[in-house]
Amino acid sequence: MEKFVITGGKPLHGEVIISGAKNAAVGILPATILAGDVCVIENLPDISDVAVSLKILSVLGAQIRMLNRNTYEIDTTHLTSTNVPDDLSRQMRASYYFLGALLSRFGKAQVAMPGGCNLGPRPIDQHLKAFSALGAEDSVDYGMITVRAKEGLTGAHIFFDKVSVGATMNGMLSAVMAEGQTILENCAKEPHVVDLANFLNMCGADVRGAGTDVIKVRGVERMHGCTYSIIPDQIEAGSYMVAAAATGGDVLIENVTPKHLEPITAKLRRAGVEVEEFDDSVRVRRTGDILPLKINTMPHPGFPTDMQPLMGVLLSVAKGTSTITESVWDNRFRYVDELRKMGANVQVDGQVAVFEGVEKLTPAPLRASDLRAGAAMVVAALMADGTSEIEEIGHIERGYENIVEKLRGLGADICKVDRAPAALESAM
């Protein structure tokens, strides 16, 4: 088992280049199945979720060739299976995108209930609702989800009961080769939803309206390959923005789309942080105190839930009382117990957390309970004077490429080391 060892109290300075978007990559990689051809995907982040997605494609029969660290050639012409292995499905939440892609091309698919972060129930009922409306039947037995369209898929009018990124993306994946037109309403509008639609259209699909409440998909008989570059990662960029602010640093964050960062930028500015925008970069610097905020997470273009733990860490040292209301995911406040170990004064009541700012955080042994909580703990450790250790860092590496190297490049004192096994573990 590995862990991060971080000695904090040093402002971050310098430049950091943002990787491709995880949430776009895990949708676009399954979408290559629809091409039935050769696709070249550029700007793929070198993270474990992408590695699992590529492994799934390989097991299904795709021919995969790495052109460089962030570019892969994927040939899905001759797939040999529509069943995603259980052990791979459970390693990442986004494995459910293989349901929509395989169903669309082959009329059937089987995937285990997805894994990934422990953020409470993440039901896929809205995904199954879309599949059913298009003419598929589904069953869930012993943790395996099976979908099948014996008579093929036919376009339909689908209204999602709640805004869901996953359901919106699976709705597009399953509809692109259905007969006729599909209308998806109450859709998610996140940048990675738009990125998936753009990729599908590059492959010959007819998807219109992505980024709005209503997406219209006109089915096509066949699709083809393309070369496509994934958008920069909005949440990775936001994470480094918060890290710069939290440490009192000055960081230029490159390879970003500033418009995608507007909800984060607005909150940081209200907290007293200077954010300067350029064409494809932002500069974040802080010289004064952090001011208290009220944050309510919402679907895009609201404040992203993935950034909530990171902002919580920042607000733990604000000059006053801050509140965060979590409106998207249950269990998103799991990081608070770890933050309290560092001296933070935080009270959680249901989906609302109240932060009474303290002067500073102190080092502590920490645990990454999920991806974004883990990133928040990294920032907290960077803020604290002294050395902290973070365990269960596999969660963090699911979504952050080269986080140790990137932070070191900004002057952070961080390393990854093997965790010595406990005595009981050694005896087993």
Regions found by a protein language model. Name each.
Residues 1-428:
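Short, structured segments at the rim of ligand-binding sites
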